[in-house]
Design a protein with these regions (language model features):
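N-terminal positioning helix adjacent to the helix-turn-helix/winged-helix DNA-binding module
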Residues: 76-79, 90-92, 124
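Short amphipathic alpha helix immediately N-terminal
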Residues: 87-104
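DNA-recognition helix of helix-turn-helix
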Residues: 114-135
């Protein structure tokens, strides 16, 4: 795994949480949008598992998955923060934090850190990843 991939795990875990949140909202909508159809015909009622039961079962599963994903996310963030905090150069720590932990765009990072153009921030990012790799693996190259 490259150093960049190591940091991208944070964003991947965030995407998983957003997906689970969307599923949770779907089950909430299912549970709250229950309508009963009365036709007057015998046997016209719904058979089997109701929408409420389906929504409740789905919601319980999603909440369990969300709990596990938040725990995983927290662990990944702590690992990334630990690695970043050990990088000697402050500007590289800031750049990696803004990009991978805060999720800032390249143009926002460039503005925030005073880089004159995107190429400068890309170049600094490359150097920051090299420094992170040195720290992670305890190497000078």
């Amino acid at each position: 795994m490259t150093t960049k991939d190591y940091f991208l795990r944070v964003r991947a875990a965030e995407r998983e949480i957003r997906l689970l949140d969307a599923k949770k909202r779907h089950y909430e909508d299912m549970g709250f949008s229950i309508t009963t159809k009365l036709t007057g015909m015998p046997g016209s009622g719904q058979r089997g598992v109701s929408k409420v039961e389906t929504a409740a079962i789905g919601m319980a599963d999603i909440l369990s998955d969300l709990k596990h994903q938040y725990e995983r996310y927290s662990k990944i963030v702590k690992e990334a923060e630990n690695l970043i905090s050990r990088i000697p150069q402050g500007k590289y720590r800031q750049l990696l934090t803004l990009r991978y932990l805060v999720g800032m765009s390249w143009s926002s990072i460039s503005d925030e850190m005073g880089y004159k153009d995107r190429n400068s921030v890309y170049r600094a990012h490359g150097y920051a990843l090299l420094e992170a790799k040195k720290v992670k693996y305890g190497k000078e190259n």
